[in-house]
Amino acid sequence: MASFTLDLLAQLPEAYQAFSPLIDILPLIPVFFLLLAFVWQASVGFR
């Protein structure tokens, strides 16, 4: 059982290799929302 778990964990990086570009972009999403808030406030005139 333990060796099966270790084998599964060893295969995970290969399984998620296709999502590598997505994982590079994910940390930028909060920055995008912060900038969106500034653009929104600028459009309504910083009420």
UniProtKB/Swiss-Prot annotation:
Propeptide: 1-10
InterPro entries per record: PSII_PsbK (IPR003687), PSII_PsbK_sf (IPR037270)
Domain of life of the native organism: Bacteria
Pfam families reported in the protein's UniProt record: PsbK (PF02533)
UniProt-listed GO biological process terms: photosynthesis
Membrane-spanning intervals of the chain: 19-39
Location in the cell: Cellular thylakoid membrane
Keywords associated with the record: Membrane, Photosynthesis, Photosystem II, Reaction center, Thylakoid, Transmembrane, Transmembrane helix
Topology versus the membrane: Single-pass membrane protein
Cellular compartments per GO CC: photosystem II reaction center; plasma membrane-derived thylakoid membrane
SUPFAM superfamilies cross-referenced by the UniProt entry: Photosystem II reaction center protein K, PsbK
UniProt subunit comment: PSII is composed of 1 copy each of membrane proteins PsbA, PsbB, PsbC, PsbD, PsbE, PsbF, PsbH, PsbI, PsbJ, PsbK, PsbL, PsbM, PsbT, PsbX, PsbY, PsbZ, Psb30/Ycf12, peripheral proteins PsbO, CyanoQ (PsbQ), PsbU, PsbV and a large number of cofactors. It forms dimeric complexes.
Family: Belongs to the PsbK family.
Function: One of the components of the core complex of photosystem II (PSII). PSII is a light-driven water:plastoquinone oxidoreductase that uses light energy to abstract electrons from H(2)O, generating O(2) and a proton gradient subsequently used for ATP formation. It consists of a core antenna complex that captures photons, and an electron transfer chain that converts photonic excitation into a charge separation.
Protein name: Photosystem II reaction center protein K
Organism: Parasynechococcus marenigrum (strain WH8102)
Name of encoding gene: psbK
